[in-house]
């Protein structure tokens, strides 16, 4: 979800509504039970709107997980919307604020039909763009700027794996999101 919100993103309420409608319709077509979203702007407000729209557009019941962060602001975050008919979140959402806040979150879920549990980690690693310095400077190896930061973010997820599996009581762990790296780049092979 790119630039969804008010105050930071669309320039007017008309643009906001167009973007909201387009995004909601696209999500409804995916027909998922859980949406792990990145690039959410205006925080809880955007998640609440999308959950309400999904409920309206699909006839299924959707909710979002309130992570307790502020509603408005010029920031992006990650978050979860889930179908309450199919899954239930369990445990308290864990935040991993290594390098960039509000963009790496971990939540346990239980599938209602089977009782199976799993852990879903939604992430949005630092972008390759910009002009980093030191280890974050573009090294000319095709991985772009801030590769060291992305590696640090990946290592942070791995180093907290045991904590997450203990917290949520399960070892089925799925990492999703925008890692801003290709399959053979350092953040993925770490």
What kind of region is each of these model predictions?
Residues 1-190:
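Divalent cation-coordinating acidic motifs and surrounding scaffolds
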